[in-house]
């Protein structure tokens, strides 16, 4: 199973937040993808 992305913290840069958001979206997609 994919690892859950780690929240970069309240002092994260916009780049870190964007990367986290992208990783989180990919992570959720992997969790919710139907398994055939």
UniProtKB/Swiss-Prot annotation:
One of its GO terms (molecular function) is hormone activity. GO terms for cellular component: extracellular region. This is Pancreatic polypeptide. It comes from Macaca mulatta (Rhesus macaque). InterPro entries: Pancreatic_hormone-like (IPR001955), Pancreatic_hormone-like_CS (IPR020392). The lineage of its organism: Eukaryota, Metazoa, Chordata, Craniata, Vertebrata. The keyword Secreted applies. It holds the Pfam family Hormone_3. The gene is PPY. Its main location: secreted. It is found in: Secreted.
């Amino acid at each position: 199973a994919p690892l859950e992305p780690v929240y970069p913290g309240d002092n994260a840069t916009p780049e870190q937040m964007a990367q986290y958001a992208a990783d989180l979206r990919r992570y959720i997609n992997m969790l919710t993808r139907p398994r055939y």
